[in-house]
Amino acid sequence: MLSVLDIFRVGIGPSSSHTVGPMRIGRRFIGALKKRGLLDQTDRVLVELQGSLALTGKGHATPKAVVLGLLGLQPETLDPATADADVARVAQDGRLKLGGTHDIAFDPEADIVFAYDNIPDLHPNAMEMSAFDADGAILFSRTYFSTGGGFIASRRQLERPAKGDLVHAATDARFPFGSAAELLAHCAAENMAVHELIMANEETHRPRAETEAMLDRIGEVMMACIDRGLRTDGVLPGKLGVKRRAPALWRKLVESPNSNEREQLFDWLNVYAMAVNEE
């Protein structure tokens, strides 16, 4: 079954399936080219977004995620402060370094295609990735699927699932459960709190100290996201020119003489949520 580290993931927003997943797919495609010795022969890459990725991709920053993935960047280690600049540079220069090393011509407007009428039968979030040589011949082409939660899969993985592949995760935990009722039943039988039982399950995957360190890292990223949202003034990305609201509201709360009063707790929660949303 899934680990808490599969559920709580570091990555760019706004969507795990339409942003994190496509970014991982782009990077995985580059890995496939390297594995086959085709990266240096690649002169062009064409990305076709299908199904929901095409229909709602622009609003979920899917093209941005595709570019970042082709650059070889990872959601877990991406610097959000430089991501937009990296994507803008590709659009401006018309060049992209595949995997961060191999330079090709790349125009996001032409080389990322929105196939609105192509609705896949296997899964609604599909990306067809194709690499071409200098003569225009196809070197390698593969369709991947963003299955939700940042998970990705090839067609073969979905058609012939393997045990423990995280798309069809194996039930290998010490206390497996598929519902809240089953979870609470385990807790009652073992006289354990929910967090104790979950940690026992995590210890089937890795040492406790490693899990705790990873969760601490995720918590730090969450707090950093809030902090950036509270301190970054200006206008949100996009053509509407929407002004960021969180910084002004945060300063108003800080300066309020009753900033620690109980009735303002929800105001603080709201401004933190707004800060994350605007990030």
For every predicted segment, state its role.
Residues M1-G11, L46-L49, L269-E279:
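Short, hydrophobic/aliphatic alpha-helical segments
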Residues M1-G13, Q74-A83:
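Conserved catalytic cysteine-centered active-site region
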Residues F8-G26, G59:
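Conserved phosphate/anionic-ligand binding catalytic regions in large, soluble enzymes, centered on
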Residues P22-F29, L70, V276:
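Buried hydrophobic packing segments
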Residues F29-V45, E76-L78:
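Phosphate-handling active-site elements
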Residues L46-L197:
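Beta-sandwich/jelly-roll carbohydrate-recognition scaffolds of carbohydrate-active enzymes
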Residues G178-R228:
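N-terminal amphipathic, basic-rich helices that act as targeting or association modules
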Residues R206-E279:
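Accessory "access/gating" subregions that flank catalytic or transport cores
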